Amino acid sequence: MACKQKGDSGSPSSRFSADWSTYRSLSLFFILVTSVNSVGVMQLVNPIFPGTVICHENKMTVEFPRDLGTKKWHASVVDPFSFELLNCTSILDPEKLTLKAPYETCSRRVLGQHQMAIRLTDNNAASRHKAFMYQISCPVMQTEETHEHAGSTICTKDSMSFTFNIIPGMADENTNPSGGKWMMEVDDAKAQNLTLREALMQGYNFLFDSHRLSVQVSFNATGVTHYMQGNSHLYTVPLKLIHTSPGQKIILTTRVLCMSDPVTCNATHMTLTIPEFPGKLQSVRFENTNFRVSQLHNHGIDKEELNGLRLHFSKSLLKMNSSEKCLLYQFYLASLKLTFAFERDTVSTVVYPECVCEPPVTIVTGDLCTQDGFMDVKVYSHQTKPALNLDTLRVGDSSCQPTFKAPSQGLTLFHIPLNGCGTRLKFKGDTVIYENEIHALWTDLPPSTISRDSEFRMTVKCHYSRDDLLINTNVQSLPPPVASVRPGPLALILQTYPDKSYLRPYGDKEYPVVRYLRQPIYLEVKVLNRADPNIKLVLDDCWATPTMDPASLPQWNIVMDGCEYNLDNYRTTFHPVGSSVTYPTHYQRFDVKTFAFISEAQVLSSLVYFHCTALICNRLSPDSPLCSVTCPVSSRHRRATGSTEEEKMIVSLPGPILLLADSSSLRDGVDSKGHRAAGYVAFKTVVAVAALAGLVAALGLIIYLRKKRTMVLNH
C-alpha cells in the first residue's frame, strides 16, 4: 500500500530571509497546520513543495520537478536543525530526479505522521550560502496499536476487505463536501476511474472514521481478477484511492488479494490449496509466529507445488473444537496470514480456515430390509470430498466385504445380514430395529504420513413391525411334534446363452437358436422363486432329442447321474458359478459340443431339443445319493445312486437348437471321429474292389471257355 501527495509546481524564492529562531517558529507552525511545509536556512520559501511525495508502507519517494536540475541543486535529508542525517540510507537518482528514504532512519513520527526534512542546496559557487528546506510528511499506515494483520486483506465468505490508515481530517465526500473529493481507480490495465457513488453500484463499499478508511470488495466487483484450481478460488484487484483537496493530492494504493473455499481435510492433515497465479509465497504466519517458506517443513507444514500450491498442515498444529455435527472434533486455525511477492509488491491476505464438518449419513427406512434377512445398501464414491476410496470401506466391527463393486460407476453394494457382520438390534414398542455402520476411518489419529483419503461413516437402519414377517428368530422352547414331510412344488428352468459369460439368456421368441457345428451350446439350469442358501441344485440326467417329446428316440446323452457322459468323444463341460449371482448353489451351468450330434459325416438332426432332470438337495442334511455324488461315477454304480421319480423334475428348453454345417465344420467333424470311421470306410472300399475284380475274372473265364468250345465244334 502506498499514498501519494502532490502539490502545486513552483521554484524556490530568494527574496525572503529569516534568522534561526524565526525558522523554528514558522517550521513548527507549518507542521501543525499542513502536511507539507518548506523553509529555507537563509530565507523562507513557498510552503508548497514543488514536487510529488509518494507514501509507501515503509518508505517515502520524493519526485522533484523537471525544471530543477541536479547540476544546479543538491538534495539531502536533514534534521530539524538543518544538519545532515548520517545514518539515513536515502538513495538519490539524478536521472529520474527521485529521492527514496526509509521511514525508520530518515524520519520522525509525530502525531501519526512520518515527518522528514529535505534540504535543497544551490551548487553554484556564487550561491552556496543559499539553501532551502522543505518539511514533508506521510501518514503512518501501520502503527503498534493496530491489529495483528494490519496491511493485509481480510477474507470472508463472499468478500474481501482492506483498511487504510489516513491523515486525520480526511473524510468522506458525502459527510464533508468541502473537505475534498474522493475518486477510485481500479484495474491497472483499463484504469477505470469511479466516484465513490459509482463504486458502490459496482461491488465496492466504504467505511470512514477519523483515522481509517475500510474498503470492502465483493468477489464479483468491477476489476476483480479470478483464478481457479479445482474447488479453490483466488480473487485479486489493484486499488487506487485518490483524495484531492485545495493545495494537495493524496493517493492511496494497494493490491487486494483473497482466497475462497481453499481447505480440504482428512484424518491426518488440513490441506490449503492456492490456485496458480503470478504471485509467489514468501511467508506464512499463524499463532503470532512468522515462518519463511524454507522453514515450513521443519514446523509441520508440507509444501506441494503442482498445478498451483498446496500447503498440508499437520493436525497437531490445529485447534480442536467439539461439535455435535462432527465425528470426532472440528479442526481449525484461528487465523492464517499468507504473504506473497506479486508484481513487484508485497501482498498479504488473512484467511480463517476450518474443516467443514458434515453430519454422518444416516438412513432410517424399512425399505432396506429384505424378506430373507438382509439389508441392501449402496455407497457411491462421490459422497465425500475428496472422492471416497471404496476399497477402504468396512461393515461394523467385522471384515465383511461388499457383494458387488463397479469402479467405473463409483458404486459399491453391501448385502448385510441381520444376524451377522456386527449388526445390532433393539426393541422399541412393537418394532425391532436393526442397525449397522459402514465406515472408512483411520485407526490412528493422525498417522505420520500425508493421506488424501476421506473419512466416511454411514449408519444404516431398518426395522420390522409387529405386522411384518418375522425372520431369523431363535425361540428356545420344547421341541414340536414330528411333522409329516411331503415334497413341495419345485420350479426349474432350462435356458441357453450366447457365450460362457452367462449374462443374458435367449428369450422365448428367439428360438430356434442357430448354431454351427463348430460352436458349443451353453446351457443353464436354475431354481426359481427360492431364497434358501442351504439348498443345492443337482443334475441327474440331460439328453437331446429330435422332437419336443423328452421320451422320443433317438436320444443323445449329455449328462448321466450328474456327471459328464464319458461314452462320447465330445464330453460335456461344466462351468463354475461365480459370485455374480446371489445363490450360486441354485445354478448348474455346462456346455455341449455340437459334434456330438454327427454320425459318419452326417448331421443326425437339424433341430435338436434339450431336456434335463434335476432335484433339490439340503446342503446341511443330504437326503439323496445324488446329493453327494463324486464324478466320474463307475458304471456298476450307475442308476443305483438315482432318486425316486417323485423327487426329480424334468425341464426342457423353450425351443429347439437349429444345427447348421458348413463344409469345413463337416470335414473337421469327420476327421475328429478318428481312425475308427476312416478305417471302416477304407475296409468297405477294399471289399468292393476285390468283389468287382473277382466278377470280372469269372466273366472273362466264361467267355474264354465258350470261344474254345465253338472252335472245337467247327473242326
Curated annotation (Swiss-Prot):
Gene Ontology CC annotations of this record: collagen-containing extracellular matrix; egg coat; endoplasmic reticulum; extracellular region; inclusion body; multivesicular body; plasma membrane
UniProtKB keywords: Cell membrane, Cleavage on pair of basic residues, Disulfide bond, Extracellular matrix, Fertilization, Glycoprotein, Membrane, Receptor, Secreted, Signal, Transmembrane, Transmembrane helix
Species this chain originates from: Canis lupus familiaris
Coiled coil: none
Signal peptide residue numbers: 1-38
Record protein name field: Zona pellucida sperm-binding protein 2
Family statement drawn from the similarity comment of this UniProt entry: Belongs to the ZP domain family. ZPA subfamily.
Record localization: Cell membrane
Gene3D superfamilies found in the cross-reference section: Zona pellucida, ZP-C domain, Zona pellucida, ZP-N domain
PTM summary: Proteolytically cleaved before the transmembrane segment to yield the secreted ectodomain incorporated in the zona pellucida. Proteolytically cleaved in the N-terminal part by the metalloendopeptidase ASTL exocytosed from cortical granules after fertilization, yielding a N-terminal peptide of about 30 kDa which remains covalently attached to the C-terminal peptide via disulfide bond(s). This cleavage may play an important role in the post-fertilization block to polyspermy. Additional proteolytically cleavage of the N-terminal peptide of 30 kDa occurs in one-cell and two-cell embryos.
Site features described as Cleavage, chain residue numbers: A171, D172, H637, R638
